[in-house]
Amino acid sequence: MEQEVRKKQMKKQQTLVLIKPDGLVKALTGNIITELSDTRLIIAGAKIVQVTRELAEEHYQHLREEKFFDELIKYIMGEFHVKRVLALVYHGDDAIKKVRGVVGSTNPEKAEHTTIRGKYGRITSEGVFENVVHASENEKEAEREIKLWFRPEELATTIYPTESKEVKKLEYFWKK
């Protein structure tokens, strides 16, 4: 009975996870995915992305006024490591909370040592957080980020409403 009530309180969510260039160059992809799999969430989408300046700036638009913005853009674009990111969408009960718990604090020095960022992240001598992964902070951010990084047909499950439009071929677009 208690388990049924708890299950009803859980909310199906999706969240974006990026394994950043420093995570890829350090060959941490397998370790990170293994740790994320402990959440028992479903991978709804996965792809390797070469991050453009436009994508990076749109992703980090909320940090545009920060003094570290330019370094952050260079970092996610792979100018310090490799020029690619592994983008993943996880789906399931309380996905955001579960993933954020495994990932840890944005600042690797403040992250619990058992979390991904606590184990593998660092702060460079220039003050750049090489925190290995990104994870959406809340539902609104998750939706915005997933729609930014993935087209509907790239996801194995429909998580947001879409509509089809006739272009050169049948394509799907996120509903506004």
Set out the residue ranges of the language-model regions.
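Non-catalytic terminal and connector segments of soluble metabolic enzymes
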Residues: 2-176
